[in-house]
Amino acid sequence: MTRKQRAIFEPALVRTALLDAVKKLDPRVQWRNPVMFVVYLGSGLTTLIWLAILSGQTTGSALFTGSVALWLWFTVLFANFAEALAEGRSKAQAESLRGVKKTSWAKKLSEARFDAPQEKVSADSLRKGDVVLIEAGDTVPCDGEVLEGGASVDESAITGESAPVIRESGGDFSSVTGGTRVLSDWLVVECSVNPGETFLDRMIAMVEGAKRRKTPNEVALTILLVALTIVFLLATATLYPFSVFSVEANQAGSPVTITVLVALLVCLIPTTIGGLLSAIGVAGMSRMLGANVIATSGRAVEAAGDVDVLLLDKTGTITLGNRQASEFLPAPGVTEQQLADAAQLSSLADETPEGRSIVVLAKQRFNLRERDLHSLNATFVPFSAQTRMSGVNVQDRMIRKGAVDAIRRHVESNQGHFPRAVEDAVESVARTGGTPLVVADGPRVLGVVALKDIVKGGIKERFAELRKMGIKTVMITGDNRLTAAAIAAEAGVDDFLAEATPEAKLALIRQYQAEGRLVAMTGDGTNDAPALAQADVAVAMNSGTQAAKEAGNMVDLDSNPTKLIEVVHIGKQMLMTRGSLTTFSIANDVAKYFAIIPAAFAATYPQLNALNVMQLHSPASAILSAVIFNALIIVFLIPLALKGVSYKAMSAAALLRRNLWIYGLGGLLVPFVGIKLIDLVLAALIMS
């Protein structure tokens, strides 16, 4: 799901942004943006010159100088307004999150069990390691891990999703978030953070962006903009002595004024992108939140735009994720009912969809009823990422089910033999895109349970789009190579990693990074944490464990693994917006040359009148028109900076050509039209 997006120019936000824009005139704020700080200084200088003219201390046109000074201040204010508007949208989102935080009470337990003695304490007094009981109707007082129990939890205040979710001890759905509400049953939870460090607190801090640091690309672009500003500053500074010399040599005209030089400098330096750069970064974070993804920093959003390798879990991302048992394929000498009986026993305590489907299929085929593990005096062996199998120990039987290679190792370690007929059955299931689970009883292989999964509709087309963009897709699965190859071919991914372990994921990420590539992945379990920490873009599922959320640099509140593709799109859109507006900003300097250079020097060098291709009314109106256009273009581009440029899936070279045509050519032509229209308005005002 996505959050409802606020209108860009919502009246309440605009009022707040206007006030903040004035507050940002503080020099301590302005110097952080070097390009706009030059405009800020130029505004102050022309204002002083205007005051000097009014007081008779110097000569010049008070109307012209005052008008230039006024529009230079507007340029600074418009840039401040763009940044304040972007920040205001983020702050409004943060306020809605802050409303989730309520003063609540907690039932603190003396021990980690349901019937332990309890005391009522303030949620703010809870510390990491404290254990609390949360019952139906209670607000979850802290972030933590479920130690005991299971409950239905309303997380709509955090995720925006109205459907309740199940949180229970063990597995990858054991994490609870402070501020959510338990709807039924009960949970015993161990707090995993101290006050002020909760997920909600971190969300608010991230969204507000109070301590937003510039990303590497922003820093690099800022250095480029500063370099251009210095070049234009030096070039403009040399024009004054050149003008004085030219007037004396030609005995014509008058030296160019400081006001005109300041106007020329401001129009030539990249004020458009300089004024919008910060707003673009803030808006990128805001758009990510609009997709219900919390990014820990702008660096993470930017990295998403540079990603060229996506590691995608098969289950839930590429396939629907609800694999169902469809067939029992017994080994030689084993009846189908014997295999079904053992498979059902091994799955009685397995709460996964696959495990439950095995129990149901055995019941449907052979009327095998569920049995109680306690009455059988059996011990359940849970699945782990390392062993890649689960099962049950009952009496003298050691029943295991799991991946082919895992069961093979288990059987051979017990001096058993893996039958060729079972290998053939495994290959048969795998070739059709199914997942074979092998069942063994000690050293004896009993047969194969076939699991069927379905590839999501439209996923192949999405992968084709990513391929056009130069992004490699890699499917990660615990299935054997044959199954993985069949599903990979059906889904259209570029590569796959079969029989994946946490160590294999980590090694694959490091391999791609060693090749200079940026890697993105999703994860929700504690076993995913090392790989999430290593990946350049790591999207942790909100439903996952605390360890996974701490290891990732983004959290998907919807817990939808497919969201990784949308995250990459948002990141690329932010980078494209920044690049497009930089191209536009630099390109529109050309028209300003044709406006200001003839106006400033035509009196001394009449030949320069040939450059007045726009036939502007007068030197004063030409200069003022360029300054006004330079200010207004920032306002007109604010929606584009906040929403992002339109994005289409294509190669980097094709995108570059497209943007050069739209924003490069547009940057050349739009100022000619804009400056001419403003000049016509000024001329009409002068004539009236």
Swiss-Prot record:
ATP binds at residues 350, 354, 383-390, 401. The keyword Phosphoprotein applies. Its main location: membrane. It comes from the Bacteria. Disulfide bonds: none annotated. Mg(2+) binds at residues 524, 528. It is found in: Cell inner membrane. It is a multi-pass membrane protein. Keywords: ATP-binding, Cell inner membrane, Cell membrane, Ion transport, Magnesium, Membrane, Metal-binding, Nucleotide-binding, Phosphoprotein, Potassium, Potassium transport, Translocase, Transmembrane, Transmembrane helix, Transport. It is an enzyme of class 7 (translocase). Signal peptide: none annotated. PROSITE patterns: ATPASE_E1_E2. It catalyses: K(+)(out) + ATP + H2O = K(+)(in) + ADP + phosphate + H(+). GO terms for molecular function: ATP binding; ATP hydrolysis activity; magnesium ion binding; P-type potassium transmembrane transporter activity. InterPro entries: ATPase_P-typ_cyto_dom_N, ATPase_P-typ_P_site, ATPase_P-typ_TM_dom_sf, ATPase_P-typ_transduc_dom_A_sf, HAD-like_sf, HAD_sf, P-type_ATPase_bsu_IA, P_typ_ATPase. The system is composed of three essential subunits: KdpA, KdpB and KdpC. Part of the high-affinity ATP-driven potassium transport (or Kdp) system, which catalyzes the hydrolysis of ATP coupled with the electrogenic transport of potassium into the cytoplasm. This subunit is responsible for energy coupling to the transport system and for the release of the potassium ions to the cytoplasm. This is Potassium-transporting ATPase ATP-binding subunit. It comes from Yersinia enterocolitica serotype O:8 / biotype 1B (strain NCTC 13174 / 8081).
